[in-house]
């Protein structure tokens, strides 16, 4: 028999396209017979057969083993769509019917058979592919989506009788206008690799090369990506390179040995899944090729890698030490992805303090482009959940992120993980009455979109969704019938548009010179103010997090300027307290403190925020003198107050 030629890179752990050889592929044998060639890596197996509907799932066609540990067979007369499995006789004496690890499609759950599939979709997205990049100095505003619960298809039902799903192409037609209306640049899909359990949301994978059949075929998914690209929207795939589902018909003890997983106590994760063995080079090639499939075959624009903390450290526990094999694999994976698809975006969900996660591999970094800022997320949500009267005591929570921000290339994420399992949704986490939650939600998102870092929001955040996410139900679209929720989604769209149209909010955001605190000592007042700078532009961001307004609040600047209001979270359009005819521009006055010689005075609404565009004006030569005099007067006033307090104490 002519064995398939397995590239040496597969055995060295450096292969990114093993799916071109392993799995099932249409071919013609030396005698001219058309059929399908099957190849599976199972070095510990004593025998393997291909079974399917073609023989009634009985005896099967025996496969032959090469010295490489790869079993292969050619079967004529099969057709695309036929189902098959491998009966693997394991080293432990077992004989188990297993799905093909490299199959391109699998039947709908609860079925687990692999499906003969050709990948021959033709894209027409050349213009997009040529201009896409990593968005270093461009907006990156990601919509995180679970394809099965964003919206259900009216009148359709699933095989189990529940509300129907849109297929991939139908989903594109519904979704793309919403993404464009809300100025998202990319959609990030929760894992679409095949998985048996809906409740895992795709994070307990069995078919790493199979696009889940829940929502259609591989060709329909390619059509989804193509449609997004034609409308200028990137597609990012959520990928699970750390652990896999322990189902007996999939990868677990595939050939009767611990082939893909560790054989010790670190072989099982906290979720009951199996941890990949990164010290097995063929496993590294398996994972690299699975990532490569999304980038190459399906034209995805990036990959978000899940649970990276569980790879960097054994069982995700720094006390157990660094898993150097995993670190080496991730470096190799990111290096290979960037070498082959240099304009792709590669992101890590990592909650650890592991160093240089986003540093290039040539500088001994792990090589990711961005890392989720879990600290920013926790501090922000904790602060806004705090009662107003207690906020002065935790004022520093909203300052802390900028102390470490430049250590990595961070992305700010309010993801699906924050709106499930009793954590409450974003709006429901906030302190206060319904009206106070509404006002604070606008300000929280103002803080997110004016803070340095790329952005990601889970579907429903833009609706101010009150119900926690449930993968079995679609979003509560009827919320848009209520004035606040309709106004909020319009505010969210306006905020996203502002983010996309103001270069100072994204250009140079990883450069410390492009950010400056203006007010970060206003603990009692709950006011924060900062400058964003880029392309010669200065934007002043001002945020009041208390439940009372501040009249004539002074902000001290280093230069004289006029200030034009760009965005007001309390505008009546969004359900705020301000009327349309209110003042839109302001000017600094001479005199300040702290070496800042000019003062901008604003009336700050309760729980409200302003974004202002600053235009420099000619300086007053006496401004420094006035500022010094004002500082001296304040110093004398403080000394006088201290003396009076001391005299009272003596009495």
Residue spans for each PLM region:
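Short, contiguous acidic/charged loop-to-helix segments that flank catalytic cores in large enzymes
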Residues: 212-216, 278, 320-322, 430-436, ...
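Substrate-binding/active-site clefts of carbohydrate-active enzymes
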Residues: 107, 127-137, 146-322
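Short catalytic/ligand-binding loop motif for oxyanion handling, primarily in non-cytosolic enzymes
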Residues: 95-96, 151-153, 195-198, 243-247, ...
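Conserved alpha/beta catalytic core and glycan-binding cleft of carbohydrate-active enzymes
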Residues: 109-110, 299-301, 315-472, 500-555, ...
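Short, flexible loop/turn elements at secondary-structure junctions
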Residues: 42-44, 54, 67, 77, ...
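A Trp-anchored, charged/polar loop motif used as the substrate-binding/catalytic surface
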Residues: 123-128, 170-173, 284-290, 388-400, ...
